[in-house]
Amino acid sequence: MCIRDSIYIVDPFIEKAFPERHQNLWQAKEMARIIGTRGYVVDVVDYMNRNAKLKFNYDMVVGLIPRGIDIYTKHMNPGCLRIAYLTSMNLAITTGNEKIRLDELKQRRGIELSPRRGSSTVIGKEIEQFDGAWYIGNKYNFHSYDCFKMPPSFRIVNSGYAFDWAKENIERDSKSFVFFASSGQVHKGLDLLLELFSQHLKDYTLYVCSGYEQEEDFYQEYHKELYETSNIIPMGFVDIESETFREISYKCTFAILPSCAEGCAGSILTAMSAGMIPIVSKECGFEDDEVINLPDCKMETIFGYVVEYSQKDQNWLKNAAKHSMEIVHSRYSKLCFSHSVEKALDGVLANTK
């Protein structure tokens, strides 16, 4: 049997030694390995490659949708199993939520910025005909697909890290926060944090670790907050294997991410792995006993949570840091990811016998 696996990317299969700059690099290889243990020959295609020249017909296709499946339409054997891999909330919801954030920004500052995370291509009713769906996130985020009659669906657990240098029992600055994200600064809520920390939280420190420099309109609009505000430290992209990231994790008590849509925020798992306490929107995909979930992302709500939790005593903060690391170890380890993929794969196979 053959399976075409277009779940993520081909980089980790090509590079002999690849840095774990993102969870999906290791996860892609591990997913292919697990599928191979069920008797399949696994091929891998980057989900962004729309011109892949396929040589075989396949008995199973696992891919991101709507982008990751259509190129296989003419290369499926009769009875080919189709599994949708959902790494975020419903794209229609994601796009709508980002638009709300951009509209709110326009009302506040009179500037219209470009969307970064939304998509004009959304998932359609065809997903109802799939043999299974694998999703990263929790039930709250998976409910964004309630508009569909979903096929048998299985949760895939995102994975954190086991940093051998991470420390739980150290005294960090309770007024130091880190924003740790990738692209889509408004989507992730950086605009809200920059305005809050520059105007209302001047005695707090915010480290900004993200790709804001690659978003020219955002970069220009928030240049003053980023580069002319003493309590905001612009770091840009930070390699999680670097000494810089380690130093930030020893300084900052909290990681904060008021995102409008996620699957299960990998950057927050990374921060938790390093001993930081997460304050996040419920859209980040965590349960209430795992993180500090914001009830909403209004400015006054974020402000209140920042102030409230920064006033906790050091004993509470150290216990919370320890709890963050324990949650990653017990619920979001690499082993947890592997077990969830095995369970999801076997679940689809069992339902189609």
Please state what every model-predicted region is.
Residues L113-S153, A162, D217:
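A short, active-site helix/loop in glycosyltransferases that binds the activated sugar's phosphate group
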